[in-house]
């Protein structure tokens, strides 16, 4: 293992991350909100740590090996979440313990959107901005790692996706080099953020709210600058804008690149994963609207329509915004929505969950097993986009699903052991493992009431979900650490 190469990259990451503390610092100084000193100290600590890692190995030229890539990907979130917690920890308002600060930081960077904070409307403006910025930075990291780095390690949904689907994204790389790929993705991500912010602003949000919510919308994060989330604005137009951008952000960013290059919007509909993604959103929305209408949950049909559509898209894409308390919805709707987050969005997007592409392959494998029972001697290939999928890919999908299920059960049992009720335990793990945010029971609105051990368990859940299980678990095997 190239330890020096890993240390150098960690040092560079921390040094770059320290510069992201300057915007909230400037906002604090301008607004005199009392958080200037925490951000100054946080900046100096993070910069010093980055230089401390980088300086002794600055002259080493060895390239990281494949094995090092796994460690670097995990450290990306572990280290940044740790140092990202410092401003929360040092802040007087809000006053946060270590578990709370790390939880909030991890939730931001993994774009989970679960929060331990209450009274957001009264918090310092710099802290509010910092939370939103954490999600935006985390979202960009997710895209670059998912599309450019993880496939080289043989992990992640995009590895399955681009290797098997013909058409606009069949190439092994978007552009010849990772650096160029990252740059292309950066422009798309930045462009979507600017477009989203402008749309929010034109719809009536303040400039601060528009920028902050564009950060968490495009990142599919779910953090808001208000306790009532998007419901604070009470605007169908703003809700509609959020729905559009949540769907766009839930689609494979490599596909966005291909659409821009080909200048053909129909490219989206030619993609099997996108078709299933949109079909699932439509189907669940119809079910939700029927149940809400029959139960007379809202007196106004327009309110039924907007709340129903918004919450389905928000939860199914794992964003986690709310316009209403969906946990109070009738019948099976709350459970259905929470379970929908386990599927999530498309591979190569900022969405959480298992990803649509894996769900498609699991369904096709199930269909094949049934057909095989009827025709035992037949050779029935699984096809995606008209092209056979190798058995190794199917095995990888089932391996992921098995580990995902096992991790879910273990984490849920661990949460139950902390003393929370079953609904809270299972929904909290579901929400954090799928990077959703809001759950049911005691975590329907926030996670402030969860004990310190429970918060650490959920931090692991968030990290495990964001790293798509394999990346983190591979570090726990003795084989990985042998020379």
Task: Locate the predicted segments by residue.
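Membrane-proximal intracellular helices of multi-pass ion channels
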Residues: 1-483
């Amino acid at each position: 293992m190239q330890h020096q190469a890993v240390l150098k990259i960690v040092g560079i990451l921390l040094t770059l991350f320290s510069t992201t503390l300057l915007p909230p610092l400037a906002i604090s100084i301008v607004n005199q909100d009392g958080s200037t000193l925490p951000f100054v100290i946080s900046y100096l600590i993070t910069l010093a740590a980055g230089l401390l890692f980088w300086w002794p190995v600055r002259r080493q030229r060895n390239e990281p090996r494949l094995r090092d890539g796994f460690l670097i990907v995990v450290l990306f979130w572990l280290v940044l979440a740790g140092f990202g917690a410092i401003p929360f920890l040092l802040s007087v308002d809000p006053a946060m313990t270590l578990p709370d600060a790390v939880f909030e930081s991890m939730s931001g960077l993994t774009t989970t959107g679960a929060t331990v904070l209450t009274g957001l409307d009264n918090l310092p403006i710099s802290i509010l901005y910092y939370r939103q910025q954490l999600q935006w930075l985390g979202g960009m990291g997710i895209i670059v790692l998912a599309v450019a780095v993880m496939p080289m390690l043989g992990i992640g949904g995009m590895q399955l996706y681009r290797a098997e689907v013909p058409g606009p994204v069949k190439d092994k790389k978007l552009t010849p080099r990772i650096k160029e790929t990252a740059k292309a993705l950066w422009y798309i991500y930045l462009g979507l953020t600017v477009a989203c912010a402008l749309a929010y602003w034109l719809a009536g949000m303040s400039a601060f709210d528009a920028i902050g919510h564009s950060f968490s919308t495009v990142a599919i994060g779910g953090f808001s600058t208000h306790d009532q989330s998007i419901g604070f604005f009470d605007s169908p137009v703003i809700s509609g804008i959020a729905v559009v951008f949540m769907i766009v952000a839930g689609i494979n960013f490599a596909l966005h690149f291909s659409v821009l290059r080909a200048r053909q919007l129909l490219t989206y509909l030619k993609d099997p994963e996108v078709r299933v993604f949109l079909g699932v959103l439509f189907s669940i929305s119809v079910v939700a609207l029927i149940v809400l209408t029959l139960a007379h949950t809202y007196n106004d049909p327009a309110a039924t329509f907007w709340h129903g559509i918004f919450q389905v898209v928000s939860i199914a894409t794992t964003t986690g915004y709310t316009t209403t308390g969906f946990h109070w919805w009738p019948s099976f709707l709350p459970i259905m929505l929470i379970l929908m987050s386990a599927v999530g969005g498309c591979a190569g997007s900022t969405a959480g969950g298992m990803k649509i592409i894996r769900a498609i392959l699991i369904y096709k494998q199930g269909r094949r097993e049934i057909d095989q029972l009827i025709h035992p001697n037949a050779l029935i290939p699984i096809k995606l986009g008209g092209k056979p999928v190798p058995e190794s890919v199917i095995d990888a999908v089932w391996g992921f699903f098995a580990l995902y299920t096992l991790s879910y059960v273990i984490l849920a049992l661990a949460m139950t052991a902390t003393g929370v009720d079953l609904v809270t335990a299972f929904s909290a793990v579901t929400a954090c493992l799928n990077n959703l945010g809001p759950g049911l029971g005691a975590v329907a609105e926030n996670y402030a009431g969860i004990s310190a051990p429970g918060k650490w368990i959920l931090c692991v859940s968030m990290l495990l979900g964001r790293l798509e299980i394999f990346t983190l678990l591979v570090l726990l095997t003795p084989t990985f650490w042998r020379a």
